[in-house]
Amino acid sequence: METRRSNLTYSVIKEVNTKNGPHMVGKTTAMLEDCGFDACHIVDKITRNCTNPVFSINGVRMLDEYYVAKSKLNVAAGDTFNEEEGKRIARERVLDKYHSDLNEALCAYLQDAREIVARLENYMLKHNIDYSSALTEDEIKWSKLSGKK
């Protein structure tokens, strides 16, 4: 999965010196920083484009401030050190962690939004309030999100 982020950094340790001489480590660490408000920024951008923005980002779960993942050379299996491959593996792992957390936060917000809609519709039905003029979810998708009028 791709990322547009510039805050992905790498730390590469090829070998370490021991009392018995150099020892091949081949460890690559990828760190994705400054992630805490990412889900909030996405929800804020979406809600700002609503016809009547009434939802806020107060209920959006914060992400971890940073994510870390590593790849390590398996000397016993006969691996040879390849810095680019180590970076690719570490990058893939850190982005998997990040996107899993981001998706979980966005799904939780969506669940809350759907519950609000269900509770509001239930209230309006109980009190005989006509809400037929409000667009349905499918009508909103068709008219506002597909570019069609």
Residue ranges of model-derived segments:
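Catalytic phosphate/metal-binding cores of nucleic-acid and nucleotide-processing enzymes, i.e., regions
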Residues: 1-149
